[in-house]
From Swiss-Prot:
InterPro entries: Poxvirus_Bcl-2-like, Poxvirus_sf. GO terms for cellular component: host cell cytoplasm. GO terms for biological process: symbiont-mediated suppression of host innate immune response; symbiont-mediated suppression of host NF-kappaB cascade; symbiont-mediated suppression of host TRAF-mediated signal transduction. GO terms for molecular function: protein sequestering activity. Bcl-2-like protein which targets host toll-like receptor signaling complexes to suppress innate immune response. Interacts with host TRAF6 to activate p38 and subsequently induce the expression of several cytokines such as IL-10. Also associates with host IRAK2 to inhibit NF-kappa-B signaling. This is Protein A52. Interacts with host TRAF6 and IRAK2. Keywords: Host-virus interaction, Inhibition of host innate immune response by virus, Inhibition of host NF-kappa-B by virus, Inhibition of host RLR pathway by virus, Inhibition of host TRAFs by virus, Viral immunoevasion. Belongs to the orthopoxvirus A52R protein family.
Length: 190
């Protein structure tokens, strides 16, 4: 079976003609005027840099997802390595994760709701939110995600995104992004 295809373009239309065994069919289709672009979302797991176009919330979403599902036993780049350092800030501000695990009963059915309520109380107790508070909160969320992963509560990492939205506004996310960019440049230069 032979099939012949001819395509001709005229103005804003193109014609597709197919011939198969003495049968001819023509189709007239309008040209698509709008260009479509596929948006490719970067995978931040092995990222070593942080660009101005990168969205901090998207980066945190991936960070919590990877940490909640796979942990830190996988290879990750300098960006995630810098975010991992926020864990230390969290322990300084909120205490050890073991204490919080017991106090909030993180492994229980209500553990996720208890955590969100705790975040709301923390936000209310702060008179003026600082970047340090926000960095500590990111570290706390990451530590909580580790607790849930170890208990095989894999889908709970999404509660940390909710906590971040409750606690950190876009302005503070931009400040955190600048701090991370500076740290990454400093690490690269040393």
């Amino acid at each position: 079976m032979d099939i012949k295809i001819d395509i001709s373009i005229s103005g804003d239309k193109f014609t597709v003609t197919t011939r198969r065994e003495n049968e001819e069919r023509k189709k007239y289709l309008p040209l698509q005027k709008e260009k479509t672009t596929d948006v490719i979302k970067p995978d931040y797991l092995e990222y070593d840099d942080l660009l101005d176009r990168d969205e901090m919330f998207t980066i945190l979403e991936e960070y919590f997802m990877y940490r909640g599902l796979l942990g830190l036993r996988i290879k990750y780049g300098r960006l995630f390595n810098e975010i991992k350092k926020f864990d230390n800030d969290a322990e300084e501000q909120f205490g050890t994760i073991e204490e919080l695990k017991q106090k909030l009963r993180l492994n229980s059915e209500e553990g996720a709701d208890n955590f969100i309520d705790y975040i709301k109380v923390q936000k209310q107790d702060i008179v003026k939110l600082t970047v340090y508070d926000c960095i500590s909160m990111i570290g706390l969320c990451a530590c909580v995600v580790d607790v849930w992963r170890n208990e095989k509560l894999f889908s709970r990492w999404k509660y940390c995104l909710r906590a971040i939205k409750l606690f950190i506004n876009d302005h503070m996310l931009d400040k955190i992004k600048s701090i991370l960019q500076n740290r990454l440049v400093y690490v690269e230069m040393s």
